[in-house]
From Swiss-Prot:
Belongs to the TACO1 family. This is Probable transcriptional regulatory protein LPC_0711. It comes from Legionella pneumophila (strain Corby). The keyword Transcription applies. GO terms for cellular component: cytosol.
Amino acid sequence: MAGHSKWANIKFRKGVQDAKRGKIFTKLIREITVAARMGGGDESSNPRLRDAVKKALNANMKRDTIDNAVKRGVGGADGEAMIAMRYEGYGPGGVAILVDCLSDNKNRTVSEVRHAFSKHGGNLGTDGSVSYLFTNQGEILMASNQPEDKVMEIAIDAGASDVAVEDSQVEIITPVEAYHTVLNALQDAGLEVEQSHLTMRAQTLVPISDETAESLIKLIDMLEDLDDVQEVYSNAEFSEKILESMN
């Protein structure tokens, strides 16, 4: 649990910091537009849009900017025709990596992703080469100063598949189809949710050396800095020393 949740916390904080510098607003707007185009502009019936809007609000994006992105998506004809793509590969130490992208130019995107892998000791794989090592799930993180029995009861009753408590945090894992039901149940009960998102969660984390971790982090950072890249997932288990250094 710790490897997953601590890495999620670090990525969340990094995302907020990047948003303040304007680095990820373009990606968030793109995700909102595509989600609205694919599933309509009603957040209540479009889980992907609801999740994208939540990310944007967490990054302090103005509601007018979000609404305009939704309108562009629903309008359909305006703007670029974005395509969702997923690339799979191996990083330093044989770590499995998934890269989710939204792009209007597949050739540009694959070239940039391949270059990042090559530069930092990895290699791009074929479809299916590592995706079987991950499961699409919902992840909800809460502070553990809330009544644990109540959190567990509500989460499990609403469809959560696992609830774990460690240190100062409660981590709730859900099937994709139960994610919003569980999240709404917790919030309706007046419980405070620190983070929530849909993610590709590694089924098993692979321990790596600190030296390998440093190379892997450079690769992940380079991938995440690409305009077309939306999310990067890996099955690496980082040491406490590395996690602390990233805080």
